[in-house]
Amino acid sequence: MAMMQRSVSERPLHGLRVLVVEDDYFIAIEMCNALREAGADVIGPARDLEAGLAAIRREQIDCGVLDINLRGRMAFQLATELRARKIPAIFATGYDASMIPAELADVARLEKPVDLVALRRAIEAACL
């Protein structure tokens, strides 16, 4: 029996390589699954700062979805590294916008719990 393929319109992130950096296992899996359903090639989840940096340096990435607090360490270095490579980032966080450094204030921010449709739309807006 042949598997049915979803059309590109049903998979709006088709072909995009999205890095997910999230230290909460359940949130990470939920995000990754939703992004795959939308057609993204998911890199990660990276669960800490070092794994996120390694992925940025090793992988071809179109967009990064970053939790701000990774096991007590702030992920702003990841956003800066992505920006240096001209790759858009999106913060998925419980932190208020006032916690984000001024030089990263223009990075899109979604509040947790992240609405997965809003996440998909933010990635579309940043990358397409």
Label every model-predicted segment.
Residues Y25-G44:
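Two-component/phosphorelay signaling modules centered on CheY-like receiver
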Residues D48, M74-Q77:
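Acidic catalytic/metal-coordinating carboxylates
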Residues E22:
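Conserved acidic carboxylate
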Residues M1-R17, D115-L128:
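Non-catalytic signal-transmission and effector/linker regions of two-component phosphorelay proteins
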Residues D67:
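Active-site residues of response regulator receiver
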